Structures are given as structure tokens and as C-alpha cells.
Amino acid sequence: MFSRLVLLRKVSISLGRYYSSQAHPQTYIYNLLSKSKCRSCGIQLQDKYPDKPGFYRLPGQNDNNTDNKSKTSELNKKYEKILQNLDVSDRNLLINNFSAPKQEHEKITSVPSLQQVTPVEEDACDTLEVQKTQQGQSLSCKRCNDVIYNSKNKSVYDPKRDNLNKSEFPIPKLQQVLSTIPIDAPLVYVFSANDFPMGINQEIFQYRPPQQIFFVMTKSDILIPKTNVAFYNNFKKFLQNYMFKRFNVPRENVFIASGKDRWKMNDLYHFIPNYAYIIGDTNCGKSTLVKSLLINHHVKHWKYEARQQRQNERPNGKQSSSASLKNKDFKQLDRLIDSFSSKNGPGTSHIPGFTRDVVPVDIDGIKQLFDVPGFTTNENMQDIFDKLNHKQIARITKGTSTFKYGSLKSKFDTIKNGQVLSLNGVGYLQFPGQDSMYQIRNVTRFALHKFKNLEKVDSILQRNEIPTSMSSHFIVNRQQQQQQRNEIRGYYKRYIVPPFYGTIDLVIKDIGYINIKPTGKKLTNELMVLYLHPSLEAIIRQPILNYIDPPSPKKLIDGTKMKSFITSDIGKTPFYSRLIPSKIPSDPSSFLASSPSSDYNQLNQYLQIDESSESAYNDILELDETNKYDYWIE
């Protein structure tokens, strides 16, 4: 029976590759080259030029490192010294010398070296590893190994500046990525729940009609509790409506999953077409999603075999259709997943640009997918590595739970009277003055800190070194702290936050969002201003929680109920708005004392509103439910 299954699997693989070669010759080429590619990033492997991309080293191959040799030699010396001081019987036991002379007076004339004392099983493991290497399996380039095991290596970080070596982590544009994909191949566009809808690049519809693209929201564990089916259905219904009314994407082409928690993997397996290319923004979770599909399929086979084994262990040969797994089975499963994940691609990392070429992924010979490098529209995206160390990047891009930190029951902080909110030093949000008050809920990994005003922030950044007591609020590298001086005036970008009425989310790409709720009576039309590092992008949107756990519909004056957030016509009102780019005064003396009227003028000019018209934004305009979206632009 087992040989028959193996034969059927081989036949299905051969037929699949044959048909793919007929329909998509480019896909067939990727399959042929997959054995000589890095399993993690997809780059073509080479072993001749260590300083060029794709260099790899075979397992067991020496580094010719003199430091390692000296360390090994010193270890041998200590080992031999200890061995000489042992009794003969203990010495024979230590070195497994069972053929040693039995007489105590006989002495050992030579001491075996440390390399000779190796377990017998290691030879078999080495042989198996060599066989895997000869078959071209589980090979990774040096850069990928350094990211996983040695992140301080020069192939990852520039040793002179402790920042990202950008030549090893290229990030292409959308057009470059699509040029590597067959024009009629299925496309699966992955975007993150962490910064929705910023992960959807609308340029994709210039190359493919919306009816031919499948959309998958991943990292949904950040938004939706895994056990709450009602919340999942609510948000899925909203997302399908949004994608249909905003981009004309068929509702059945939209799916929600979580690669990290391997949530909805069985349904996702059937949702994604065979030979599909997985595309999306860099760091959106594409590789994690593909890897989770691969692991999920592997786990299903293992559970089936484990249950079969449990049935065979039952007394008196009793058979059962559902043999339960034991605790030791699940412990073994965790080890199996870790081992399988470390040996099978694609690789995953928090560093943008980790995937460098198309990575073919064969799921048990039944379905084949292609993990594609992520793209970006922000040319300054990698500049954040000039400011932060890699540990901080890994921390702030993980995201955090909406229901734990963003719900009405979550802890909030209060901002008032023109205070400035620091986003760990990579951004500063200036709030209006004149007795204004806001509730802030932090749904990011940023450590937020309140300053009295912008002058206080500026005075700290003007110092030669940030005080130790404040260092946790500025997560820049020590080497870069000196360079941060004057950057609010020059390097950081200034944005005007469009006017809003009610609660909003300030969304920061790849990071998360900050929920902002005005409290008390509105006394000023003064606008919020955001100073942001150029590598980051931000928008405002309607509160995402309203579409997961919507409030009960309110009754109108005539007694009818308002439509809920989920069933409302999302096409008639903007769901989000871009921020308004603003000029930073070149004169330092006028920088901290810019008037609100200057921001009003820039807002009206950007939206092409005549300042003499009634709709022009100014101090006398009344903002309410009827016009609260008039100054939003998608």
C-alpha cells in the first residue's frame, strides 16, 4: 500500500511539472533551477566568489579561520591534560576503548585526539547530510545563514556603521516583480492586517484586472481573536464588501488567514489556485504564509501516522476510527515542526528584502506555489536601519493585539493642551492646544512618551547626547544619536493630519496603529501635525474595531435604524485618508512658532479648495457628522 502511494505521488509530480511546462514555460524553468537555488531567499547559488550574492558553503567545509584553529588546538591541549590524569579504567571508558588491555599495570602509550572521540551515530548523520547536499536540498546562501545564526556578520550589517548592508537586501518595485511572472499565471496578493489598507498597492490593477487576482489578508491574529467566529465573520464580510466596492474585486476572491498561528490553513490551501505566484509588499507575511501551508500539510500526514500507531498499540488488537494523540505526541510534534521549518524554505525574516528571487514551494507534489520578492513604493524604506538596530526593528514590526490594547476596555493615556507624543523617537505627533483633550490607545510596539511641547523635544535633540534617563524613549543607535540632532527641522517629514470628527486610527505602515479619541467640547480647529522618519509612512482611517465588533445600529428621528458599519455603503464615505505633505520652515526661529493659519492654507491648497469659499478650512468652519469626510483624500 505504501509503495503504491509513493508511486502515485511521483506520477502526480511528474504530470504537474509536465502541464506547468506546457502552460507556463517560465514556471517550468523555475522548477528546474530550484535545486540550485537558496531555499530561503531564492537566489542562484554559487561557491566561487564569497563577496558576491548567492555564495554558499557546503556543510563541513572549513572557513580557513586561524582563530578557530587556535581555539580547537587549545581545547585539545586541555582535553589531553585531563585525560592523562584519569585512571586507566576511567580513561578507557571515556574514549570507548573497549579493546584496551585489561591489566592495570599496562599503560596507554598514546592519547587519542579530540576529533577521534565522536559518537558512532554522527557518521550516519554526516552521510545523510552529504546525501541531502548532493540532491540539492536544504541549501542556504551565506547571507541567509548569517541572518538566522549570526546577525552581526558583515554580509548583513555594515561593520563600520552597524546598519543594513543594502546591497544584500534589494527591494524591487511592483513592475520589476511582475516582469518575472508569466502573464497568465494566477496571482495571490497578500497584505497585512497590521496596517490595512496600506498594504494594497493600487498599481496592481494596471497590470491585471481585479477579477483575476486573489487577495489574502494575513496576520489576522493581530485583529481577530482566534476563537471568536462571530468577529471573524463580521470582518470578513466587511473586507469582502470593501474590496468589491472599492476595487471591484469579486467577494469570493477575498480570504482572511494567519500564517503565524497557521489559522485557516486547510481552507486557504483550497482557496489558492495551483501554480499561483504569491505577491505583496515586503514584510507583509508572504513567506510565513507559504511556509505555514507547507508545515500544515506536513503536520496532517504526521498526525495520521501517529494515530495509526496508537491504534496498533491498543490492547487485543482493537481498532478505532479516532485514536487520540497523547501528550508526548504533541511534544514530538513541536520538535518536528521546528526541525522541518529549519530545513525547508522559504525563509522568513523581519528584514525587508530578505527574499531575492522566486522560490518554488512544492506541497507534497499536489500543489505548487511560488514565493515572490516583496515590493515597495517607498524608496526610503530601508533608511530606518540607519537609525535602529536589528533587535528594535524585530520588536516594533511584530504588531500587537487590537482587542488587548485597542478596545474600549483597554488602558488609555490622556493628551491635552498641545502636548507632543513621541513614537519612540522615530515620529512625533503634535496635538492642538487651547484646552483640547484626547484619549490615546497604543496598538503598536512603540514606547510612547508625552512631552510638554515641541520646544521640549527640540531641546533634548539639540544636546550632544540624549540623557540616559530618556534613552529608552529614543530607540536610535548610539552611533546615530549625534546625527539625529536638527532632524526634525530637516530630515524628518512633516505631515498635516486631515480634520476629523470623532475617533480615528493613525496607522503606521508595518508597525500598527494608535487610536485617537477626542473628548470634551471641541474648542479649536487647529490641526494635528506628524513629524515622521522618511522610511515610515502613515494614514488615518475609521476605527478598525467598528468593523470587527460593530456597535448596535442607532435609531434615526423617523424611527428607522441606521445601517451597521459592515453593511453600510463603504463606497460613499472614505475609509481612510492620506496625510497632507507639509513644508518645514527653513528659518529655525519660525520653526517652533508656525501659526495654525499656515497649516490651513496648505490643507486648502493641497485639496484645491478656494480659500474664499464656504468649504475652505479655517477657524470659523464647523465640523460635524455632515462634513467630517470632506477633507479626507484616499
UniProtKB/Swiss-Prot annotation:
Transmembrane segments: none annotated. InterPro entries: G_CP_dom (IPR030378), Mito_lipid_metab_GTPase (IPR050896), P-loop_NTPase (IPR027417). Keywords: Mitochondrion, Transit peptide. Disulfide bonds: none annotated. Residues 171-378 form the CP-type G domain. It is found in: Mitochondrion. The keyword Ribosomal protein does not apply. GO terms for cellular component: mitochondrion. Residues 1-40 form a transit peptide. Its main location: mitochondrion. One of its GO terms (molecular function) is GTP binding. PROSITE patterns: G_CP. SUPFAM superfamilies: P-loop containing nucleoside triphosphate hydrolases. May be involved in the mitochondrial lipid metabolism. Belongs to the TRAFAC class YlqF/YawG GTPase family. GEP3 subfamily. This is Genetic interactor of prohibitins 3, mitochondrial. It comes from Candida dubliniensis (strain CD36 / ATCC MYA-646 / CBS 7987 / NCPF 3949 / NRRL Y-17841) (Yeast). The lineage of its organism: Eukaryota, Fungi, Dikarya, Ascomycota, Saccharomycotina.
